[in-house]
UniProtKB/Swiss-Prot annotation:
NCBIfam families: NDH_I_L (TIGR01974). The keyword Transmembrane applies. Its EC number is 7.1.1.2. It catalyses: a ubiquinone + NADH + 5 H(+)(in) = a ubiquinol + NAD(+) + 4 H(+)(out). It comes from Carassius auratus. This is NADH-ubiquinone oxidoreductase chain 5. GO terms for cellular component: mitochondrial inner membrane. It is a multi-pass membrane protein. It is found in: Mitochondrion inner membrane. It is an enzyme of class 7 (translocase). Belongs to the complex I subunit 5 family. One of its GO terms (molecular function) is NADH dehydrogenase (ubiquinone) activity. The chain crosses the membrane at residues 1-21, 44-64, 88-108, 118-138, 139-159, 172-192, 243-263, 274-294, 303-323, 326-346, 372-392, 406-426, 450-470, 490-510, 587-607.
Length: 607
């Protein structure tokens, strides 16, 4: 069995690396690299199902492999892979979602002159994520972690001729660099105190240590990578990249890496109340804040981006509840419908002459029925509609939240955020799909291309059945609460329905609204993203620049000028005055100087 696991993983890596290695081939004329990349990912997906089926059939808990890589006198670094529920379920999902995204990208990016390089970037992005997921030691995990970071920079800034794309890419790197500091510090702490980076050894050796400091480092790392409150502004900015990049970034790679890190190292956290409470409160705050921002945005991709951030907040809350499995389940179900929402958005944007403002859409159901249907299915799955993929994870999370002993504010914020999910999802569907068309009649609408429909259809199936399939084959590690009052059981559904009713009321009010931009403080707060980018990206740099300028001026005036040339001039002034008085035409002075010079000349002779 171990042999099958190893050989299948190595085969997956080899298949995925083959298109990348062909870059070294000097004779590449006429090769369809983009199509080859898509085929490689689809083949890797089918191969990855083999170890998953064997694993589920044998009911094993996990398989760990270990090869020594290098060692110093005191420290070993190994290459070790971990095959357990998390890695063996996530890898096929990541490959499946990427396969659909690459197929969509064949259509979306067909006119790009560098499409081959674009596909290689996406493939490297996926490989880095697979390395991160299957890693059993911190060093390997760090390689995958940095890999997804650098590839996100290259992909977000793909259209580097645009200043906004460059700024967004740089923003993503800088915010993630803050998170990386947390991970590097934690790894340094592990190396110094536990003398090991092997995850299994860390679990055993950490029993005698107070793990608060490294866990805070891990929380910081997850905050940066998974765009939690405080380090979240890079996520909506990342929408400057092409739509396939947004889909891959938000579904199964970059943004879930932070949450996955906490899931992998969760045994360290489960008895540390400070770390759990930090995750819980941070997640609740992120979920509500980003859901609030999504309510008033008008850019279709930004609304979907904020919904991602809100769902990541929900995953963080789940980790704070000591339920890493539920967080993982939500990662898996979320990947399908989030990728599908982005691909539908991309299809709509492309069909409406690159229009992203939802106020200039509408009535697409009669013109683009397939895309509109899938878009609606994705939005329903996101809100947690019963029996779609999102319901299985979201409902379980809200149940766990309602039946736990925890901070009541965190519970309230999360429930409000869940309600807001229904509001912005309905608003999105209402403006894009329903109503009358509000766009130019000349738009080149065509959704007959099989590359578009097949890729979105594949994800739509995932959005419908993935939750059921995963929950049927995934035994919970912790016993869930089996009995609870009906109101608690229905809480998730009730808040979603409440949000839906509010959204319908708001949609009716929108048509009666006279002013284009109503000056309401709450609306303004939400529309300006809580003034966060303004404060962080404008006010703070301005204050620092002003402080720097005043410090430089003071140094220049006092030390460099007053103590330098001016100070020197002042000290020489007395001497200069004395010597200057000589040439004023006074006969007494001349005679005195003449006599003194004469005496000085005669003295050596007399002596």
């Amino acid at each position: 069995m171990t042999l099958i696991m190893h050989s299948s993983l190595l085969l997956i890596f080899f298949i995925l690396m083959y298109p990348l290695l062909t870059t070294l081939n000097p004779n590449q004329q006429g090769s369809n690299m983009a199509g080859m990349t898509k085929t490689a990912v689809s083949s890797a997906f089918f191969i990855s199902l083999l170890p998953l089926m064997i694993f589920l059939n044998l009911k094993t808990e996990g398989i760990i492999t270990n090869w020594q890589w290098m060692n110093t006198q005191t420290f070993d670094v190994n290459i070790s892979f971990k095959f357990d529920h998390y890695s063996l379920i996530f890898v096929p999902i990541a490959l499946y979602v990427t396969w659909s995204i690459l197929e969509f990208a064949l259509w979306y990016m067909h006119s790009d002159p560098y499409i081959d390089r674009f596909f290689k970037y996406l493939l490297t992005f996926l490989v880095a994520m697979i390395i991160l997921v299957t890693a059993n030691n911190m060093f390997q995990l760090f390689i995958g972690w940095e890999g997804v970071g650098i590839m996100s920079f290259l992909l977000i800034g793909w259209w580097h001729g645009r200043a906004d794309a460059n700024t967004a890419a740089l923003q993503a790197v800088i915010y993630n660099r803050v998170g990386d500091i947390g991970l590097i510090m934690t790894m340094a702490w592990f190396a110094m105190n536990l003398n090991s980076w092997e995850i299994q050894q860390i679990f055993v050796l950490s029993k005698n240590f107070d793990m608060t400091i490294p866990l805070m480092g891990l929380a910081l790392a997850a905050t940066g990578k998974s765009a939690q409150f405080g380090l979240h502004p890079w996520l909506p900015s990342a929408m400057e990249g092409p739509t396939p990049v947004s889909a891959l970034l938000h579904s199964s790679t970059m943004v879930v890496a932070g949450i996955f890190l906490l899931i992998r190292l969760h045994p360290l956290m489960e008895n540390n109340q400070l770390a759990l409470t930090t995750c819980l409160c941070l997640g609740a705050l992120t979920s509500l804040f980003t859901a609030t921002c999504a309510l008033t945005q008008n850019d279709i991709k930004k609304i979907v981006a904020f919904s991602t951030s809100s769902q990541l907040g929900l995953m963080m809350v789940t980790i704070g509840l000591n339920q890493p499995q539920l967080a993982f389940l939500h990662i898996c179900t979320h990947a399908f419908f989030k990728a599908m929402l982005f691909l539908c958005s991309g299809s709509i944007i492309h069909s409406l002459n690159d229009e992203q403002d939802i106020r200039k859409m509408g009535g697409l159901f009669s013109i683009m029925p397939a895309t509109s249907t899938y878009f609606t299915i994705g939005s329903l799955a996101l809100t947690g509609t019963p029996f779609l993929a999102g319901f299985f994870s979201k409902d379980a999370i809200i149940e766990a939240l309602n039946t736990s002993h925890l901070n009541a504010w965190a519970l309230t914020l999360t429930l409000i955020a869940t309600s807001f999910t229904a509001v912005y999802s309905f608003r999105l569907v209402y403006f894009v799909v329903m109503g009358t068309p509000r766009f130019l009649a000349l738009s080149p609408i065509n959704e007959n291309n099989p590359l578009v429909i097949n890729s979105i259809k594949r994800l739509a199936w995932g959005s419908i059945v993935a939750g059921l399939i995963i929950t049927q084959n995934f035994l919970p590690m912790k016993t869930p609460i089996m009995t609870m009052p009906t109101t608690l059981k229905m809480a998730a559904l009730l808040v979603t329905i409440a949000g839906l009713l509010v959204a319908m009321e708001l949609a009716n009010m929108t048509s009666k609204q006279m002013k284009i931009t109503p000056i309401i403080p709450l609306h303004h707060f939400s529309n300006m993203l809580g003034f966060f980018p303004t404060i962080v990206h404008r006010l703070l740099p301005k204050l620092k620049l002003t402080l720097g300028q005043s410090a430089a001026t003071q140094l220049d005036k006092t030390w460099l000028e007053a103590m330098g040339p001016k100070g020197l001039a002042l000290t020489q002034m007395t001497m200069a005055k004395v010597t200057n008085d000589v040439s004023r035409g006074m006969i007494k002075t001349y005679l005195t100087i003449f006599l003194l010079t004469l005496i000085l000349a005669i003295l050596p002779v007399l002596l």
